[in-house]
């Protein structure tokens, strides 16, 4: 079962709280299993230019079922995915901040976060993805509190 709107709202709400906790306004996007945008929020004060980036991070993470931070590592010059950012009509984003969302071990969507440093974007996305996974991604399941150092999905 794909990420539904109620799932996306809960993920975004939790991500907004994490972003506020670190003092960084952000754009937060959630995509479904087809990589389609389910929901997006631009926090007050978040960069307008990061709207598109957050959406593309969610798409990229779902399209390849990998954290965009990890894809970025593999897409550097000499890496096995060098040049991938130019594929898919420019929809691929290789900045940190995109993380797959899993339900019962299967990728069902992704979160994309943009507006801070790469480390901040990744930390907010990772904490929310980890909470989604620990709640088994079931609609209505409570989120567990994620620590910033959690290894992720």
What are the functions of these language-model segments?
Residues 1-143:
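Flexible, solvent-exposed loop/hinge segments and secondary-structure transition points
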Residues 145-152:
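N-terminal polybasic/positive-inside topogenic patches
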């Amino acid at each position: 079962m794909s990420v539904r709107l109620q799932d996306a709202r809960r993920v975004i709400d939790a991500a907004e709280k994490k972003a506020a906790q670190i003092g960084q306004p952000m754009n937060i996007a959630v995509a479904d299993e087809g990589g389609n945008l389910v929901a997006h929020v631009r926090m007050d004060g978040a960069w307008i230019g990061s709207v598109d980036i957050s959406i593309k991070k969610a798409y990229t993470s779902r399209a390849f079922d990998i954290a965009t931070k990890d894809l970025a590592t593999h897409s550097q010059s000499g890496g096995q995915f060098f040049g991938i950012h130019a594929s898919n009509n420019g929809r691929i984003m290789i900045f940190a901040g995109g993380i797959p969302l899993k339900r019962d071990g299967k990728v069902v969507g992704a979160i994309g976060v943009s507006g801070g440093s790469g480390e901040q974007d990744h930390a907010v996305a990772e904490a929310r993805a980890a909470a989604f996974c620990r709640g088994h991604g079931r609609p209505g399941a409570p989120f567990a509190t994620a620590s910033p150092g959690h290894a992720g999905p």
